[in-house]
């Protein structure tokens, strides 16, 4: 059997030298929220633990201020 080489995911925020994640930067936050409105885990995105905590806090603040939805748009 041939082993598949899995590319190591890297932390985008570390590479760009971001100091703090802003809750008003909605374009960045939307990339880390799934279609159902859940925060995507760091094992999938490759985000480091420090920035994953900041990301979760920023997403929760944006949700509370109604900048991001809590869940997806339900069609009835």
Curated annotation (Swiss-Prot):
PROSITE patterns: RIBOSOMAL_S18 (PS00057). InterPro entries: Ribosomal_bS18, Ribosomal_bS18_CS, Ribosomal_bS18_sf. GO terms for cellular component: cytosolic small ribosomal subunit. One of its GO terms (molecular function) is small ribosomal subunit rRNA binding. The keyword GTP-binding does not apply. Disulfide bonds: none annotated. One of its GO terms (biological process) is translation. Belongs to the bacterial ribosomal protein bS18 family. Binds as a heterodimer with protein bS6 to the central domain of the 16S rRNA, where it helps stabilize the platform of the 30S subunit. This is Small ribosomal subunit protein bS18. The lineage of its organism: Bacteria, Pseudomonadati, Pseudomonadota, Gammaproteobacteria, Methylococcales.
